[in-house]
Regions:
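Cytoplasmic-side transmembrane-helix entry/capping segments in multi-pass membrane proteins
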Residues: 438-441, 461-472
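Glycine-rich phosphate/diphosphate-binding loop of Rossmann-like nucleotide-binding domains
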Residues: 8-47, 159-250, 407, 425-427
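Hydrophobic alpha-helical transmembrane segments in multi-pass integral membrane proteins
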Residues: 474-490
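Structural/interface elements that position substrates and couple domains in central-metabolism enzymes
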Residues: 2-111, 118-149, 153-160, 166-169, ...
Length: 530
């Protein structure tokens, strides 16, 4: 039986996103589902009802009709009590739920015998789950938008300029927290020309900050900040004191501070105190991306932009929604990947398989039974390294060298003598043309070995352009063999049928390598073009 996927209008305040977009509707229909969208659901993201109709969806007039008919409901925000009341008993809900923060909502959904997949509970340590990771998608959009909001509230350029009217210094941006949102903010601010500094409790993100054009500011306190599931952990009091001292110093120098620090299931840590705000330069800006969880700044007002001590503090809780079309497109794609995992048979039905670690982590309620929190994922245990073999007491005289040791001078001399004798015999009895070809063959083997095997493995892909050049040399050699003789003297040395066949084969294989290599290289370079 084909299931109906319903997409309601989001009722949360200032929420403009929609759980699916017309392009994704077409893909859901190809999976065998029917799709219904509430009228006006996509208006905030600039998707009209006609766009959904064109994609094949049914447009439903009322929320009650949509919730009552839908087998699967796709949402962005957690459902309200009124929406839970409309949810059909035994149906499936997919979207943000935040089970740790919403225990009452969990009880209401369980009472409906619903199956609930919380996109925020996805195990982010699973590499194959990245395609479903809506938290990362929304955090990237929010980090970008945070810089845009900061630029709007800031009274100067981001980049430095020298004009006839005088010199304009670049803005100094400090980003607290270098997760997905923080890295997006760093890249955006650096792209606008600002001087960007950033800090995070996880020291391993320093290279990522530098790669985006920022400077990593380290806290003068030794403590590892990585927590489970790819998140940061709560730090010790000693670390927090050292961190506050560093933040106080940065606040005096920064023009813009963007805070992104969050700890799952807990209120946002207070990083920026009122005293730090007071020490900032007039006209400075703070964008607190943790406003929905209480804020990283003591003076943040969630959902509003306020001015305190001459500093604008932006506490908007709908940063991703302020880029509604982009956010909706990314979020809809994430949910599509979830549906694809649930509907591997592509028959318009779903199977919530608890043997799948990603689906097990997503599922917080199954048929009315609360299954959250999920059991920890069993990480594969690395095989123990084999014990080192005992070092031989003496080198083996039979081979001239021990294990891993270079050849002795005597053995090396013998090898060269044998090689010279072989060349002498070849030169004595083989025709002159064979000797010339054989010499070129030996040199080609040597050059090929030096070119390929002496290159670091990580550079093999960039080496593709060099192999294309070498392939062209081989192609020219094959063409010389295949080409007709230019005179009677040359006709006498024309290669036999076997040599011609080998030359044609070499030319064919080389052409495949050349054209294929250039095609792949072109695709690689296209990834870096804007």
């Amino acid at each position: 039986m084909t299931l109906l996927i319903g997409v309601p209008l989001e009722t949360a305040n200032e929420e403009r996103r929609v759980a699916t977009v017309p392009d994704v509707v077409e893909k859901l229909i190809k999976l065998g589902f029917s799709v219904a969208v509430q009228s006006g659901a996509g208006t905030g993201a600039n998707f009209s009802d006609d766009d959904y109709r064109t994609a094949g969806a049914e447009v439903v007039a009322t929320a009650a009709d949509l919730w009552g008919r839908s087998d699967i409901v796709l949402k962005v925000r957690p459902p309200s009590s009124e929406e839970v009341a409309l949810l059909r008993e035994g149906s499936t809900l997919v979207g943000f739920v935040w089970p740790a923060q919403n225990p009452e909502l969990m009880q209401q959904l369980a009472a409906k015998r619903a199956t609930v997949l919380a996109i925020d509970s996805l195990p982010r340590t699973l590499s194959r789950a990245q395609k479903m990771d809506a938290l990362t998608s929304m955090a990237g959009v929010s980090g970008y938008r945070a810089v845009i909001e900061a630029a709007h509230a800031f009274g100067r350029y981001f980049n430095g300029q020298i004009t006839a009217a005088g010199k304009v210094p670049p803005a100094k941006v400090f980003v607290a927290g270098a997760g997905v949102a923080g890295l997006a903010a760093i890249g955006t601010a650096a792209g606008l020309g600002a001087i960007v500094r950033a800090n995070d409790t996880r020291a391993e993100v320093a290279d990522q900050v530098k790669s985006l054009g920022g400077e990593f500011v380290k806290v003068d306190y030794e403590e590892e900040g990585s927590g489970g599931g790819g998140y940061a952990k709560v730090m010790s009091e000693g670390f927090q004191q050292a961190q506050r001292a560093m933040y106080a110093q940065q606040a005096k120098d920064a023009d813009i501070i963007i805070t992104t620090a969050l700890i799952p299931g807990k209120p946002a840590p207070k990083l920026i105190t009122a005293e730090m705000v007071q020490s900032m330069k007039p006209g400075s800006v703070i964008v607190d991306m943790a406003g929905e969880q209480g804020g990283n700044c003591e003076l943040t007002v969630p959902g509003e932009a306020v001015v305190r001590h001459g500093v604008t503090i932006v506490g908007y809780t709908d940063l991703a929604s302020r880029l509604a079309r982009q956010s909706s497109t990314l979020y809809a794609t994430n949910l599509l990947r979830v549906i694809e995992e649930l509907c591997k048979a592509k028959d318009g039905t779903i199977n919530v398989d608890f043997n799948d670690d990603a689906i097990r982590g997503l599922t917080v309620i199954k048929e009315g039974s609360v299954t959250w929190p999920p059991p920890p994922i069993q990480q594969p245990v690395a095989a123990p390294k084999p014990a080192a073999a005992p070092v031989a007491a003496a080198a083996s005289k039979g081979h001239g060298h021990g294990s891993g040791e270079p050849m002795s001078a005597k053995s090396l001399a013998i090898v060269f003598a044998v090689g010279a004798l072989a060349f002498l015999l070849v030169g004595q009895f083989a025709p002159a043309t064979f000797l010339a070809h054989f010499t070129v063959f030996v040199l080609a083997c040597f050059v090929g070995y030096m070119v390929i095997w002496n290159v670091t493995p990580s550079l093999h892909t960039p080496l593709m352009s060099v192999t294309n050049a070498i392939s062209s040399i081989i192609a020219i050699g094959a063409l010389v063999q295949v080409a007709p003789p230019l005179g009677e003297a040359a006709a006498e040395g024309r290669p036999s049928g076997l040599i011609l066949g080998l030359a044609v084969g070499a030319l064919t294989l080389t052409a495949v390598n050349m054209f294929g290599g250039f095609a792949v290289t072109r695709r690689m370079l296209a990834m870096f073009r804007k």
